[in-house]
Design a protein with these regions (language model features):
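Feature for exported/extracytoplasmic and membrane-associated proteins, marking the mature portion
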Residues: 1-104, 123, 137-180
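Acidic/histidine-rich, metal-coordinating catalytic segments
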Residues: 110-119
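Basic/polar, cationic surfaces and motifs that engage anionic cell-wall
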Residues: 119-127
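Active-site substrate-binding loop specific to GH73 endo-beta-N-acetylglucosaminidase modules
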Residues: 127, 131, 139-140
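Glycine-rich and small/hydrophobic secondary-structure elements
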Residues: 134
Length: 180
C-alpha cells in the first residue's frame, strides 16, 4: 500500500515537473536582479513561473542567517554589520522583484510578504547580537498594497535589559488570513 502511494507521488511529481519547466521556459527576458543575492535568485524564479502561467497561488522563498546572536552589528556603529547587510540584500531583492513584475506586466497579480518564525530582543547582548524575542516586523509589498505603517512604536523603557521583549500588536495569523 505504501509503495503504491510512493509510486503515485513520484509519477505526479514527474508530470508536474514538465508543467513547471514549461512555465519557466516560456519567459525569455526579465529585468535585472542583483548578484550575488540568494533571495533575488529565488524571487527571479518566482516571477518567471508566474509570468510563464504556473497556477500556483502561494510561493515561499527563504533567506536565512538572521539568527544573529553575535556580531549583528559592529561595535562602533549599530547601523553597520551583518544585520545591515542582510537587510540591504532583502531590500535589493524585493526592489528587483517588483521591477521585474512591472517589466513582465504582472505586477497587478502579485503581493508579497516577509515573515520570520521569531523576533529579536530589544537590547543587544554582550556579543553585539540579539537573542530570540517575541515580536517581529512584517513587510507587505506589491503594487496593490496600501502603503502604510500599522501599529504603534513600542515604548522602550530607559532601563531595558537583554531579556526584555516587544509585545506583539497583531496576530500574524490574521495577517496571513487577510493576504489570502
Amino acid at each position: 500500500k505504501e509503495l503504491k502511494y510512493i509510486r503515485l507521488v513520484a509519477k505526479q511529481t514527474s508530470a508536474y515537473t514538465t508543467v513547471v519547466k514549461a512555465a519557466a521556459d516560456a519567459v525569455t527576458q526579465q529585468a535585472p536582479y542583483p548578484t550575488p543575492n540568494p533571495l533575488a535568485d529565488q524571487l527571479k524564479i518566482v516571477a518567471r513561473l508566474i509570468k510563464g502561467g504556473l497556477k500556483t497561488k502561494i510561493y515561499q522563498v527563504n533567506y536565512g542567517s538572521f539568527d544573529t546572536h553575535s556580531l549583528q552589528t559592529t561595535t562602533t556603529d549599530p547601523t553597520a554589520g551583518s544585520h545591515a547587510t542582510l537587510l540591504k540584500n532583502v531590500s535589493d531583492a524585493i526592489k528587483a522583484f517588483q521591477d521585474d513584475l512591472k517589466f513582465l506586466q504582472i505586477e497587478d497579480r502579485v503581493m508579497g510578504m516577509t515573515f520570520s518564525e521569531f523576533g529579536r530582543r530589544i537590547k543587544s547582548n554582550s556579543s553585539t547580537g540579539t537573542d530570540h524575542g517575541a515580536a517581529a516586523p512584517m513587510f507587505l509589498f506589491g503594487k496593490n498594497v496600501v502603503s502604510k505603517i500599522w501599529g504603534d512604536n513600542p515604548a522602550i523603557p530607559a532601563n531595558v535589559n537583554v531579556n526584555d521583549n516587544i509585545p506583539m500588536q497583531y496576530d500574524f495569523r490574521s495577517v496571513y488570513a487577510s493576504m489570502m
